[in-house]
């Protein structure tokens, strides 16, 4: 962990203490939180393992996948029955469901059962989103997913360029094939994920990918910089920060000129189109291996071991492996960190969540950020500037490599560690 990250944490949290995660495993969860609650479901199986991908995954094996699906439904039943935020006999209203992976469509045939299990305890108000590998964008798969209730898909294109896709060890998707499948099996909202800051990639390369995505079925694109995690097998070097900023500014300028609306740090949408986000939920329950649960005062992560996950659920025990109990200041910072992804922090929303004014909690920090040109204060909200978006990205990169990289690296090696300090 860099001195810069440690200094920033100490200044912002007002404490020299590291973040302490323990093996606390509650048998009851309390989802009583201000505002909407979201749900996340993780499906870890892939046809092949991409070297650059940091997420919890393993090769698809039918028998293991079936056992996992049963355990996933079992965890949903356990949490639903033990959730103190749900009135017995009634369904708890939630905003939306997001299904990530892995390649969740490998279990498309079980997705309806998973959604019905969730539906016994939770009433989904704003639809179901699901990640798709380009090879799974087929009419018959889309039909299964629609039948299960999926209303949004995010397609992991990364790049349509054969040269750039080969750097990631993947074949380049055919945009015409994607468009034909989406036309035959339409989904209300389609997002496509793209990567920038790859070796030899120009701004024009990224713009061409964005244009192909928008011309072949996407309502929305997410354009992420490549991040080199220490525990992956990727040999692709990360770009310098200056190069990332040049590309990010050029992407934002192009989208502004062509009328695409920037609705988060990395995402751009057609005007008036449906939005797709997997990141901007203040509180959510996570199901499946490696899934995170974020509540009013706690952060929990499930084991990264598929076998360990299945065994824990079969024993009737919660599969969480580490829990962080937030201080009030830490929880405020975590809230602001994720709200900043959406480019706007609402003063009313902060007050509703914490019962205190944003300026009262972070007056000096907000003043400094405005003076430095990172934020502008609008009626009722603070908005990130283009400069602020870049420096947020830079801070997020340090956070990712200093905290997430270390945590995920440990959890890939140990199914149920006793403690983690970061």
Regions found by a protein language model. Name each.
Residues 1-37, 47, 85, 90-91, ...:
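Flexible, acidic/Gly-rich N-terminal and inter-domain linker regions that tether
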Residues 36, 58-82, 93-356, 414-415, ...:
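C-terminal scaffold of the Radical SAM
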Residues 39-41, 155, 384:
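Short beta-strand motif preference
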Residues 41-57:
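Local cysteine-cluster metal-coordination motifs and their immediate loop/turn environment
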Residues 356-370:
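Short amphipathic alpha-helical interaction segments
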Residues 370-380:
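A short, conserved structural fragment
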Residues 382-389:
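Basic, amphipathic "hinge/linker" alpha-helix immediately C-terminal to the N-terminal HTH DNA-binding motif
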Residues 389-422:
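Short, amphipathic alpha-helical interaction segments positioned at domain boundaries
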